[in-house]
Amino acid sequence: MIQSQHSQTARHALAETVVLAKARKNLSFAQLTDGTGLSEAFVTAALLGQHALPADAARIVADKLGLDDDAVLLLQTIPLRGSIDDRVPTDPTIYRFYEMLQVYGTTLKALVHEKFGDGIISAINFRLDVKKVDDPEGGSRAVITLDGKYLPTKPF
């Protein structure tokens, strides 16, 4: 039976356990994802408490991390989503995304509406990908793809 959570406490605690086990076993999120049939971004989000994993994927990941049956069950529950408090993020990486939306949020909104009309980009029917590429000027660049289904507003 599908279960859902009413608070973030249990999944936050499990996320801490996952991160510690991942570090102890020196595993990457890509290694944890192997064999699940899911994307690295989705599995990572699930392990950090933002998605439910299918039963087989939950078992595969839990076995790699040495987690118990309760953790397997918890990984399958629908979480209470949202990991950022109602304040400006202080983590530098998360803050940069916040800053990007502060600077480009209205631009993204204007361009999406101009190209698609009134509506939203789904975060449910959604794909996320992060790639590291060489910068021709030296160093590396992060290429982040946000791929969401467009959902038009329907008058009623």
From Swiss-Prot:
Transmembrane segments: none
Provenance organism: Burkholderia cenocepacia (strain ATCC BAA-245 / DSM 16553 / LMG 16656 / NCTC 13227 / J2315 / CF5610)
Gene that encodes the chain: cynS
Family: Belongs to the cyanase family.
Any one GO BP annotation for this protein: cyanate metabolic process
Family annotation (Gene3D superfamilies): Cyanate lyase, C-terminal domain, lambda repressor-like DNA-binding domains
Keywords: Lyase
UniProt GO MF annotations: cyanate hydratase activity; DNA binding
Xref: SMART domains: Cyanate_lyase
Active site, per annotation: R96, E99, S122
EC number: 4.2.1.104
Pfam families: Cyanate_lyase, CYNS_N
Protein name in UniProt: Cyanate hydratase
Swiss-Prot/TrEMBL catalytic activity: cyanate + hydrogencarbonate + 3 H(+) = NH4(+) + 2 CO2
